[in-house]
Curated annotation (Swiss-Prot):
PROSITE patterns: VWFA. Pfam families: VWA_3. Residues 701-713 have a biased composition (Basic and acidic residues). The lineage of its organism: Eukaryota, Metazoa, Chordata, Craniata, Vertebrata. Residues 1-25, 701-734 are annotated as: Disordered. The gene is Vwa3a. Keywords: Repeat. InterPro entries: VWF_A, vWFA_dom_sf. It comes from the Eukaryota. This is von Willebrand factor A domain-containing protein 3A. Residues 484-681, 923-1094 form the VWFA domain.
Length: 1148
């Protein structure tokens, strides 16, 4: 027991000047009382209250709270604070020992503050040893039960002194309480009142008279007094004044008090008054320590005085005096020696402190807020109503509407059918409208050019908006737009490592976005709910500062009671939500809520209905929770967590914002802007298509005219001269027109049979090249219906059957790709999207081997090879027969395919799939090697196994079981169990207690796993060769396989042991399973940019050589697609070069 001796001189001086000094010592901002604000009937009570006003605040003030607000740490007067104010320098390059330099002003200021603090502590200690506080200590609580030991009360000076001290206690401290219950105890108990009484002048006077009538009794029956006082449940503080040793043992009293106060908040205060010879102080001190109470000892004869409040102040004073001496030594001694001692002391101090003290803090983290006045922000949806493409009349359909015409269809009575009008292809371009119909568009290039310039300016505005949304507090919270706001902070125990991050995020919000709001409040929630204010308060500079100081004291504890926090906000802060507009709740959380998502969604949908109130979720991702001996209350992967909160926000008509260390993962505000940018790009591409269609028509005209001029004249001279028949009659004209029409169609078809690219310009026919003609199917001949018109002998005709149009080569730009998160093997996944199946081979764009490059016939080379760009592949020259548009379409498709491959690869390397691969079967058993060699990896494996349970087994499997094997087998369950939430929680607890030891008995584990009924897949995780023969295991599995047909998937922690790797490969292949090996951190860091970005760039490195089957098959297909994409980009550059040369020749 710590003892401290203090001056025992009684100080009963109540001089007003001294009382004023006491107020100053306590740093109390107490305004002067020049009159009573409330008038009472009893004037005597008013006078007594005024007389005790000067001591009221001091008496009510708790010593722990006072020391917390005036400690060295709170005042920034610790060793670490001193060193942080210095400057670290290296005097020369060879000396690696840093020196810390302090300015004279810094040292003097620090010394001055330390001296003032020491003086404050000494004044506080003097105050604690005055009047009743010296004899009985500082009484806590507002409803006090007072037990007075009357066993040693006797006549004489001691009795008079004890009565005076009790009277002083009544006047100075008990008069400030709300209720009192007093009794004396000896052999029997003598209560003053039957029940606790309200404190008033009459009750205090009655108590003083009762104290003077106390009579001594023989023994001290404390137990009977405790039974009497604990019957009154409303008391929150119990003061026991002992003058002799109790009759009962301290252990018996401690057990009784603990049982009686179970579920109640009662503070125990034990005081021994001048009885150190009769009562062992150590026994009572241990008793109060066990009860979490307060022990006070007072004995002026032996100069013994023990007070915990004074002891704590003395310890803090000694720290301050020691630090002051070190600061003074800095001015005279070698700074480096002093600093080395300081650093050692800091290390010891940090080791003793809380774990959160080790967390790094931003600069000026605890400084007052620097409040800014923001603009009136809007959500992206509201902002786009003013600045969107439709609002700015920049929709492509709005621009094309004046020049868009519907195709005309009318019923022709004479034909008894509906006839559709046709237009010449040069005049208009057919274009698909937003409603799915097709319209004829008159293309005006200057208008479209100006429109694309306006689109570019709009996209720049949207990009600026995206950048603005990604800065400062908007990166964390999004835009806080409502006028009445409540902030919900997640301070569950899983966020203990991130409490500084949570506080800093709140600081940014308070500084940048809340100063222009009307009302606000902050609610912190873990298992319990803690609110800054009972209800919302008006936004002001002082309130924002107070809220920040409150947030600095938040501690993480408990689980994540999201429903309780929402109920507090909705039912208390927004109890009048139907009477106000522009109201919002911002939930800042880092994990899955304790309650079921459907329950939360149903609650917010009902609570938020019919009022202008929104729930916005700000989810920060801090990584998968680490597995230890205490599993989390509720578990979900980050994707499931995000999905859950998105469902909740949709039910509450709010917005979802998800960010992490690398940036913003998902945001409704950002998605709205990105969608508008994509719409603008889509409009721009359609404009380019319209202009390209118009240019293609013009180029075809020019090329056809040029070909007519370049036709050899010898061809015309060799044609026989035609003999024209005599003028026919009208029916003959009709029949000949049919014949001429058919001949014309036949000749046009013959021209189309020449061997040249379909989309290229037409080539002149060369005689003697019959082998170049292509065989085609006979085309449908047109059929005419002839009739005489009403105008004389004229003949009319209409087509009854039309000729088939020429087939146009198209690149399928609307390819269908599977989802990246499809639960299947890579072999099944790539079977639906491999390049060959999608018909994306690049060889289709190349013609046959060019035979004219080495030919002596110059004209053929000039007329054929100059029209098509050529490229040399493996020593052979081949022509590129695709147009630039077709090549662009192919590149777009390939980029889409490679992006899909990258997203699938990222999915396979994320979550539990990185270690375990993809679980395919519905009924599975996980076999985990827990031999001694697995010790270094066991903690990581346990964390990933918990993630596997919730991410794959819970969602995709019907039943599962876990089995660990070393020398012996350890089963989680005897059979496969359904993957319910309760079963997953039990599995987590089982995983938490796994330990690594012993050998590797793979055969016994597989034999046991094959015995499970209805099991479909086994997943074997190990790090090396088994203890038994590999061939024996393979033969055994093969025999089991013939009977059961269970697939065995193997997982190797390392690929260094090639023998073990080959064994696991063969074991998986034997049963039709897959082999998997997790990717190392080094290999993963090399492709991190590719996976995060989602698409490839030229500078991206090649994929590493994956060992696992799923990753290897996908990587092979990705590499093949990447090579084709690079080759297509080379071909595009050749086509661009050829087109540029053509344009130069045309301009000349």
């Amino acid at each position: 027991m710590k003892k401290c001796r203090w001056s025992m001189d009684r100080n009963t001086d109540r001089d007003p000047q001294k009382q004023e000094n006491k107020k100053t010592m306590n740093d109390l901002a107490q305004t002067s009382q020049d009159g009573l604000l409330v008038t009472h009937v009893n004037q005597t009570q008013d006078l007594l209250q005024l007389q005790g006003r000067e001591t009221q605040t001091s008496a009510l003030e708790d010593s722990e709270d006072w020391l917390a607000m005036h400690s060295l740490k709170f005042e920034k007067l610790t060793l670490a604070d001193l060193i942080s104010q210095g400057t670290v320098e290296l005097e020369d390059c060879n000396n690696a020992v840093p020196k810390v330099h302090f300015t004279t002003q810094t040292i003097h200021h620090f010394k001055s503050r330390l001296s003032d603090t020491i003086e404050l502590y000494q004044q506080r200690m003097r105050w604690l040893t005055e009047n009743s506080k010296k004899a009985f200590g500082l009484i806590k609580g507002s409803r006090v039960g007072l037990l007075i030991d009357s066993s040693q009360v006797s006549s004489g000076s001691q009795t008079k002194e004890f009565q005076n001290d009790l009277t002083g206690l009544i006047d100075e401290q008990l008069s400030l309480k709300e209720k009192l219950y007093v009794l004396s105890f000896g052999v029997t108990i003598n209560p003053l009142w039957p029940d606790p009484m309200e404190v008033s002048t009459s009750t205090l006077q009655e108590l003083k008279l009762w104290v003077k009538t106390l009579q001594p009794e023989g023994s001290s029956n404390l137990l009977q007094a405790l039974k009497k006082v604990f019957a009154h449940k409303e008391l929150n503080s119990l003061v026991i004044i002992l003058r002799s040793c109790p009759d009962q043992p301290s252990e018996f009293l401690s057990d009784f008090i603990q049982q009686s106060t179970l579920g109640r908040s009662v503070f125990i205060h034990v005081t021994t008054y001048k009885c150190d010879d009769h009562v062992p102080s150590a026994v009572l001190k241990n008793l109060t320590d066990a009860l979490g109470g307060y022990y006070h000892c007072y004995s002026p004869e032996s100069e013994l005085y023990t007070s915990r409040d004074v002891v704590e102040l003395q310890v803090e004073t000694h720290k301050a005096q020691g630090l002051l001496s070190q600061v003074q030594a800095l001015c005279h001694n070698n700074p480096c020696e002093e600093l080395s001692c300081m650093i050692k002391e800091i290390s010891i101090e940090i080791a003793k402190g809380p774990f959160t003290s080790l967390l790094p803090k931003p600069p000026k983290h605890e400084a007052p807020l620097t409040i800014k006045f923001p603009d009136l922000d809007k959500t992206s949806a509201e902002w786009l109503k003013i600045n969107g493409l439709k609002a700015k009349k920049l929709s492509l359909y709005q621009v094309l509407a004046p020049n868009a015409f519907n195709p005309v269809e009318e019923f022709v009575p004479i034909l008894q059918k509906t006839v559709a009008a046709t237009i010449h292809e040069k005049a208009m371009v057919q274009f698909e409208w937003h409603d799915g119909t097709v319209k004829n568009i008159h293309v005006d290039p200057p208008v479209l050019f100006e429109y694309q310039k306006q689109l570019g300016k709009a996209v720049q505005i949207y990009e600026h908006r995206l950048q603005w949304l990604s800065l400062t507090s908007r990166r964390i919270w999004g835009t806080v737009c409502q006028r009445r706001v409540v902030i919900l902070l997640d301070v569950s125990v899983t966020n203990s490592m991130y409490i500084i991050h949570i506080q800093h995020s709140l600081r940014l919000l308070l500084e940048e976005q809340l100063s222009n709001k009307d009302y606000f409040n902050i609610i912190a929630f873990g298992s319990t709910i803690e609110s800054w204010r009972p209800e919302m308060v008006a936004v002001s500079h002082d309130n924002l500062q107070r809220a920040w100081r409150w947030a600095l004291g938040l501690q993480c504890q408990g689980s994540r009671n999201v429903l309780g926090a929402l109920r507090k906000a909705i039912e208390v802060d927004f109890k009048d939500k139907n009477k106000h507009e522009s109201q919002g709740i911002y939930l800042f959380t880092g994990g899955i809520p304790d309650q079921d998502v459907h329950i939360l969604s149903a609650y917010v949908a009902e609570a938020y209905g019919g009022c202008d109130l929104q729930l916005n979720v700000c989810l920060f991702y801090v990584g998968e929770p680490q597995m230890d001996t205490t599993p989390p209350a509720c578990y979900a992967s980050r994707t499931d967590t995000a999905t859950a909160y998105k469902e909740i926000t949709q039910a509450a008509r709010g917005r979802f914002h998800w960010f992490g260390e690398t940036g913003i993962y998902e945001s409704d505000d950002i998605n709205a802007i990105v969608s508008e940018i994509e719409k603008a790009l889509n409009y721009s591409q359609k404009c380019a298509f319209l202009v390209a269609s118009l240019k293609n028509h013009s180029e075809k005209e020019l090329q056809s005219g040029a070909l007519e001029k370049d036709k050899p004249r010898t061809l015309k001279q060799s044609q026989p001269k035609k003999h024209y028949p005599p003028k026919p009659t009208a029916p003959s004209v009709a029949r000949m027109s049919i014949k001429d029409g058919l001949d014309g169609e036949t000749s046009s078809r013959l021209k189309a049979l020449k061997c040249h690219p379909v989309n290229a310009a037409a080539q002149p026919e060369k005689e003697g090249t019959v082998e170049q003609r292509m065989k085609t199917k006979p085309r449908t001949r047109p059929k005419l219906f002839l009739f005489y018109t009403e105008a004389g002998n004229s003949v009319g005709s209409v087509y009854k059957r039309y000729t088939q149009g020429k087939s146009i080569r198209r690149i399928n730009s609307s390819i269908q790709l599977p989802r990246k998160d499809t639960v299947c093997s890579s072999q099944e996944w790539t079977a639906t999207c491999r390049l060959k199946r999608l018909k994306l081979e690049l060889s289709k764009c190349l013609g046959p081997n060019c035979r004219y490059q080495k030919s002596v016939r110059g004209p053929a080379l000039a007329e054929h090879c100059t029209l098509f760009p050529s490229i040399e592949i493996n020593g052979v020259v081949r022509h590129i027969q695709w147009t630039l548009w077709e090549m662009e379409t192919y590149i777009t498709c390939m980029e889409k395919v490679t992006r899909c491959y990258v997203q699938r690869l990222h999915w396979l390397l994320s979550g539990s799939r990185r270690l375990f691969g993809t679980i395919l079967e519905r009924n599975v058993c996980i076999l985990l090697d827990t031999s001694g060699s697995m010790g270094p990896h066991l903690q990581w494996i346990k964390t990933e196994l918990v993630l596997l349970i919730w991410e794959q087994l819970r969602k995709h499997c019907a039943r599962f079981n876990l089995l660990s094997f070393a020398e012996d087998l350890q089963l989680w369950q005897d059979t496969l169990v359904e993957s319910t939430e309760a079963a997953c929680h039990k599995a987590m607890q089982w995983v938490a207690h796994l330990q690594a030891q012993g050998s590797t008995s793979v055969l016994a584990a597989l034999t046991k796993a094959f015995s499970f009924q209805d099991v479909q897949g086994l997943y074997l995780l190990t790090d090396g060769k088994p203890d038994t023969s590999c061939s024996l295991i393979l033969n055994t599995v093969q025999s089991f396989q013939k009977e059961r047909g269970v697939k065995v998937h193997t997982i190797s922690l390392t690929s260094a042991d090639r023998t073990a790797t080959e064994f696991l490969r063969e074991l998986a292949s034997l049963s039709g399973g897959r082999y998997h090996c997790p990717v190392s951190d080094k290999a993963l860091s090399g492709i991190q940019g590719l996976l995060t970005r989602g698409f490839i760039k030229e500078r991206d490195p090649k994929l590493p050589l994956f060992e696992g089957d799923d990753l290897r098959l996908l990587a092979e297909e990705f590499t093949r697609a990447r090579n084709l994409l690079k080759q297509a980009q080379v071909f595009r550059s050749q086509l661009l070069k050829k087109n540029n040369m053509k344009s130069k020749v045309t301009s000349c």
